[in-house]
Amino acid sequence: MLVTKLAPDFKAPAVLGNNEVDEHFELSKNLGKNGVILFFWPKDFTFVCPTEIIAFDKRVKDFHEKGFNVIGVSIDSEQVHFAWKNTPVEKGGIGQVSFPMVADITKSISRDYDVLFEEAIALRGAFLIDKNMKVRHAVINDLPLGRNADEMLRMVDALLHFEEHGEVCPAGWRKGDKGMKATHQGVAEYLKENSIKL
């Protein structure tokens, strides 16, 4: 489990948003002001994967506005990533997504993040990594279960709220909701006002 630990750094080839290839793309050199969303998918040119990639890409601006970059990883080569980006959506491609797509051809990144499945492909892992490279949230889905990019945005908002106000974010918390002081009195006050909504 990586939550609360430093995220494993890596250097690998990546296809950038402008379709250039960075042969030495490093996670630690590509954090946003507040951190990064690092997500894995099993394989290019498959089925659930393009829906997730397109969903994250449609929200890249939202993540950037919150100070987070988005980086994707699969075990495919940079050439396969490039081909998939240049395949139209209506033909099963992903189109010109704007975030870097890392080529984990050695599978070492997937292994380091504990998402490598049967030494073959990555499970659907997603990691919220803060500006200090600490993993603050992780979710790993089985192959048939797609992730929700909006839930990752919610987790980003929760982390930013905690960092700014020092309040913890209870179940179902959304930006604009009241946080909770992490004390016995704080939880009692919160539950008195909000337990019916939980």
UniProtKB/Swiss-Prot annotation:
What does the UniProt keyword field contain? Antioxidant, Cytoplasm, Disulfide bond, Oxidoreductase, Peroxidase, Redox-active center
Q: Where is the active site?
A: C49 (cysteine sulfenic acid (-soh) intermediate)
Q: What is this protein called?
A: Alkyl hydroperoxide reductase C
Q: Identify one Gene Ontology CC term for this UniProt entry.
A: cytosol
What PROSITE patterns would the database entry show? THIOREDOXIN_2
**What GO terms describe the biological role, i.e. biological process, of this protein?**
cell redox homeostasis; cellular response to stress; hydrogen peroxide catabolic process; response to oxidative stress
Signal peptide positions are: none
Q: Where in the cell is it found?
A: Cytoplasm
Q: Tell me what organism the protein belongs to.
A: Helicobacter pylori (strain J99 / ATCC 700824)
- Could you describe the subunit structure of this protein? Homodimer; disulfide-linked, upon oxidation. 5 homodimers assemble to form a ring-like decamer.
Catalysis: reaction(s): a hydroperoxide + NADH + H(+) = an alcohol + NAD(+) + H2O
Q: Which family does it belong to?
A: Belongs to the peroxiredoxin family. AhpC/Prx1 subfamily.
Q: Which residues form the Thioredoxin domain?
A: 2-161
Q: What's a single GO MF annotation on this record?
A: thioredoxin peroxidase activity
The family database entries (SUPFAM superfamilies) matched by this protein are listed as:
Thioredoxin-like
* Miscellaneous note of the record: The active site is a conserved redox-active cysteine residue, the peroxidatic cysteine (C(P)), which makes the nucleophilic attack on the peroxide substrate. The peroxide oxidizes the C(P)-SH to cysteine sulfenic acid (C(P)-SOH), which then reacts with another cysteine residue, the resolving cysteine (C(R)), to form a disulfide bridge. The disulfide is subsequently reduced by an appropriate electron donor to complete the catalytic cycle. In this typical 2-Cys peroxiredoxin, C(R) is provided by the other dimeric subunit to form an intersubunit disulfide.
Q: Which domain of life is it from?
A: Bacteria
* Free-text function comment from the UniProt entry: Thiol-specific peroxidase that catalyzes the reduction of hydrogen peroxide and organic hydroperoxides to water and alcohols, respectively. Plays a role in cell protection against oxidative stress by detoxifying peroxides.
**EC numbers:** 1.11.1.26
InterPro entries per the UniProt record, alphabetical:
AhpC/TSA (IPR000866), Peroxiredoxin (IPR050217), Peroxiredoxin_AhpC-typ (IPR024706), Peroxiredoxin_C (IPR019479), Thioredoxin-like_sf (IPR036249), Thioredoxin_domain (IPR013766)
